[in-house]
Each structure stands twice: as structure tokens, then as C-alpha cells.
């Protein structure tokens, strides 16, 4: 069944997902107006993609007031990219003008449900303040290695709208497992989105620069369960207080994952736990071993929590335990997440650029026993810095502060007695860090902040760190 569309559809934000949705709509003969706050075509990250869409009939509005200018066109549907807050005044004005504001995940899900049919897809959605990307990569590899047709979609992998267009329409096509990473931004605008399996890694405070309040952020995350049915699953990290709070919103069945959940939750029938050496699981019967923790290369308790959630989710989706163990042995991690990028003169350089919250940075700091010279800072997102300050006091020998939050970090470092300096570029930050470091130390980029004050995104920040380390290595 083909989905029906209004005469004009607006796309707000022309990133990867925005362009994919625009292309899907243009294929269906819809008039599409793309709006982006970049002031020129050359500034768009997906410039070549947008140019191709212009050739297919896309109309384009650029500039700082691009979204407000859409009002004059009176679109009845506006599809929002994840980074654009529904609480902005120009978005509220667009809604008051008669436009239905829908997020890109919600729109793509409707496209999937109406044109493909839900029986063709086992939809696995993973959310959480941190840990999503590592977890979805683990799940996808476990399913693929088990011989199950699997697509990695959403924030990482293929945009969901693009997957819908490329999926075979014949009835004989086997069901596919779609593994998606979904953010609070995307969930906030969901109305019908229903994953068969909804997994949650962690819940801390984050994105208060986008959400109207802490409560708004938490409730947006909980919307991942809103449309689930009694036979759907939630996979929850029992070792995180925020995730335990989310359990009250679950409508289906729960598989708990935790360090001691097997002993602390005797009434639980489905769980993943470990005894410090072996990861065990139960799917309603006797427990069985899955993997050895010593064979999992990623550091830190937070990554072990991600692993347990990934195992539970993959088992529910049909992965084989012996294959899961093999994937764990060979998994090397994901870029920008405690990634070893080099060693110079006995000093290891670790890229944790994806740590964009204070809690994530604190977890990164606590992943190492060696002395740490920390590079941190950027644009604060309104998080709680108490845990970071404690980790700074206990585990960091010196700090190089960057970006808009640098002065706050300097004051924090002086308060806890940690050596500190400031840097105005990543190249300078790495050089300053080396001045503090000695052989055996770790230089850790774990910013605790967003990147957009100095970089395009956290990936760009991580690449600049790699580049600075490469240049340092070539000089020695």
C-alpha cells in the first residue's frame, strides 16, 4: 500500500537523513522544499547529495531564517532532522501555521509500516544517554554472524527511509532485522514508532540545550516503549538507576541485564548477567554461558554494561550463543569511543570524542589505571558535573581545557588541585598535553561537552585529534 502525502512537504535540515527522506518523497512525485540554516550550498555537509536532489526537483531555502520562511509556503507536513529542537520559536510558529511537525524516524517508520508491512521487519531500537553506537554495532554483528539478514539503520548505517526504498517487495523475501540507534531528539517526535525490541543502555541528564527540562528529556527517552505490545520486548540495563526508572513505562516483557541481576532478581525469567568471568544468560529456562569477559577488548564497566545489553538483545532477535562469543572475541570497538590512536615516546593517545556529557567523560577517565592527562571542554549541554569533578580529582594528573567551557574547567581543576592550562585548537591541546605527560601516561580526549563551538561534530573533533597525534608521531 502506498502512503499518501500532502501537496507540499518541508524537510527541515539537509543532513544524511533529511536528504534520504527528500529523495524518497521526490521518487513518489511529492513537491519537496528543503530548508537548512547554512547560508550557502557550499556550506552544506551533503552538498553533492543536495545538488543531485535539486536536479530531481528539490526546492531549496537556505539561511538563518530558513525555517520561518517556510510559513509562507504553507506546508501541511514538516519533517524535522534530529538536531533541530521542537521547542524553538520558529518551529512552534511553523506548527501554528498548520504544518504537522514529524521527526525523521517517525516519518520513516510510517513509510516502512504502510509500504512494506511490519511483518517483513524485526525492528530493534537502541537508545540511552551513552553506549548506543557501540551496542548497535555489537548487536548487528552478532545477528549477521548468525546468518540472519540484518541492516544497521538510523543514526549509524543506512537512513531508514533509504532502506524502505531498497527493500525487495516480493512476498518471498525473508524478514530482516533492522537495528537502529535512536536519540531522545528522534523519540520526542514519535507517535506510532514501535520497535519489536527496545533496548536502553543508560539514562543520565543530557541535551538540556535541546529539551525544555530534565523531565522532558527523560520522558522522551521513555517514548521508545509507548507503542509496544504485550509480546514485544524491553532490554534494560539494571545497573543504571535511570534505566531502572524507565521500567515503569514498559508495556511488554523485560529482559534485565546487570552485573548481579541473576542473584538479585530471582523472579526474573529472562536476563543476562556475569560472575566477573563468564557472561551467563537465561531465556526463560536454565541459565547458559555465553562468553568470557576477558575476551572483550573494550575497557571500562560502562562497556561491559553495553555488552550485556547487546547480548540480551541479540539473543532475543535470534543470534546463536556460540556465534555471539566469537563476535565478542573479534570486536575492536567503534571510532571515537576509547579508541587507541597512537603511542609516542611511551605515551598512549586515546580518542573518546564521543563522550559529549560529563558522565560519559567520567566513565572514560575511570576506564584506565595509568596516570591521565585529560583534554576536555567544548559547548556545555547543561549536564551535572559533580561526577566528572570527582573523577578529575581522583584520576587526572593534568587537564588541557578547550572551547566555551574552558574557563569553568580551569576553575574546577584549580578547586580540586589538578594542573591545568588552556588551548585554542586541537593541535595546541595535544602539544600542551604532552608537556604534562611522561612515559606510561595516557593522553585522553574525553571532552564532556558538545563539539560545535570549534568543530563540525564530534567525529570531526576526533579526526583532528588523530591528525595532531600523527603529526606529533612524525616529529619524533
PLM feature spans:
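Nucleotide phosphate-binding/pyrophosphate-handling subdomain across enzymes
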Residues: 2-8, 20-28, 291-396, 411
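Short beta-strand "acidic-cap" motif of Rossmann-like dinucleotide-binding folds
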Residues: 31-36, 151-152, 179, 256, ...
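Phosphate-binding loop of NTP-binding sites
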Residues: 8, 24-27, 68-73, 82-238, ...
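Short, basic phosphate-binding NTP loop
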Residues: 2-12, 16-125, 146, 329, ...
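Residue-level signal for inorganic ion chemistry
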Residues: 25, 78, 101, 126, ...
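Beta-strand->loop->alpha-helix junctions that form or flank phosphate-binding loops
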Residues: 36, 61-64, 102-109, 153, ...
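Short internal beta-strands
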Residues: 31-39, 234-238, 375-376, 395-404
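C-terminal helical cap/extension that packs against the catalytic core
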Residues: 47-56, 386-441, 476
Amino acid at each position: 500500500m502506498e502512503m499518501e502525502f500532502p501537496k507540499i512537504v518541508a524537510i527541515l535540515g539537509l543532513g544524511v537523513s533529511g536528504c534520504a527522506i527528500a529523495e524518497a518523497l521526490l521518487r513518489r512525485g511529492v513537491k519537496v522544499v528543503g530548508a537548512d540554516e547554512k547560508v550557502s550550498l557550499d556550506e552544506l555537509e551533503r552538498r553533492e547529495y543536495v545538488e543531485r536532489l535539486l536536479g530531481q526537483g528539490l526546492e531549496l531555502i537556505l539561511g538563518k531564517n530558513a525555517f520561518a520562511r517556510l510559513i509562507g509556503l504553507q506546508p501541511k507536513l514538516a519533517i524535522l532532522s534530529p538536531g533541530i529542537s521542537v521547542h524553538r520559536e520558529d518551529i512552534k510558529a511553523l506548527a501554528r501555521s498548520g504544518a504537522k511537525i514529524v521527526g525523521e524516524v517517525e516519518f520513516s517508520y510510517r513509510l516502512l509500516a504502510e509500504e512494506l508491512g511490519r511483518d517483513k521487519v524485526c525492528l530493534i531500537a537502541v537508545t540511552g544517554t551513552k553506549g548506543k553506537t557501540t551496542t548497535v554495532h555489537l548487536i548487528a554483528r552478532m545477528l549477521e554472524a548468525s546468518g540472519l539478514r540484518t541492516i544497521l539503520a538510523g543514526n549509524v548505517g543506512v537512513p531508514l527511509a533509504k532502506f524502505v526504498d531498497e527493500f525487495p517487495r516480493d512476498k518471498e523475501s525473508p524478514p530482516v532485522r533492522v537495528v537502529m540507534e535512536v536519540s531522545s531528539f528522534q523519540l520526542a517526535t514519535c507517535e506510532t514508532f514501535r520497535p519489536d525490541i527496545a533496548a536502553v543502555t543508560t539514562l543520565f541528564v543530557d541535551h538540556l540545550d535541546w529539551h525544555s527540562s530534565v523531565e522532558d528529556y527523560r520522558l522522551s527517552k521513555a517514548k521508545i516503549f509507548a507503542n509496544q505490545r504485550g509480546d514485544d520486548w524491553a532490554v534494560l540495563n539494571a545497573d543504571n538507576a535511570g534505566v531502572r526508572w524507565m521500567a515503569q513505562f514498559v508495556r511488554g516483557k523485560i529482559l534485565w541485564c546487570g552485573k548481579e541481576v541473576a542473584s538479585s532478581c530471582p523472579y526474573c525469567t529472562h536476563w543476562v548477567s556475569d560472575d566477573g568471568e563468564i557472561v551467563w544468560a537465561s531465556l526463560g529456562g536454565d541459565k547458559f554461558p555465553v562468553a568470557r569477559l576477558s575476551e572483550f577488548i573494550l575497557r571500562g564497566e560502562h562497556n561491559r554494561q553495553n555488552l550485556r545489553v547487546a547480548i540480551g538483545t541479540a539473543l532475543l532477535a535470534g543470534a546463536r550463543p556460540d556465534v555471539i562469543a566469537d563476535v565478542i572475541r573479534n570486536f575492536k570497538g567503534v571510532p571515537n569511543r576509547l579508541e587507541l590512536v597512537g603511542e609516542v615516546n611511551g605515551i598512549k593517545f586515546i580518542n573518546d570524542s564521543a563522550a559529549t556529557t560529563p558522565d560519559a567523560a567520567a566513565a572514560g577517565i575511570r576506564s584506565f589505571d595509568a596516570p591521565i592527562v585529560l583534554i576536555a571542554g567544548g559547548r556545555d549541554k547543561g549536564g551535572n558535573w559533580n561526577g566528572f569533578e570527582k573523577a578529575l580529582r581522583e584520576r587526572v594528573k593534568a587537564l588541557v581545557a578547550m572551547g566555551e567551557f574552558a574557563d569553568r574547567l580551569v576553575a574546577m581543576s584549580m578547586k580540586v588541585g589538578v594542573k591545568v592550562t588552556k588551548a585554542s585548537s586541537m593541535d595546541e591541546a595535544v602539544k600542551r598535553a604532552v608537556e604534562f605527560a611522561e612515559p606510561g601516561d595516557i593522553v585522553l580526549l574525553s571532552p564532556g561537552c558538545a563539539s560545535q563551538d570549534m568543530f563540525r561534530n564530534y567525529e570531526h573533533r576526533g579526526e583532528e585529534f588523530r591528525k595532531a597525534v600523527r603529526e606529533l608521531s612524525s616529529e619524533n
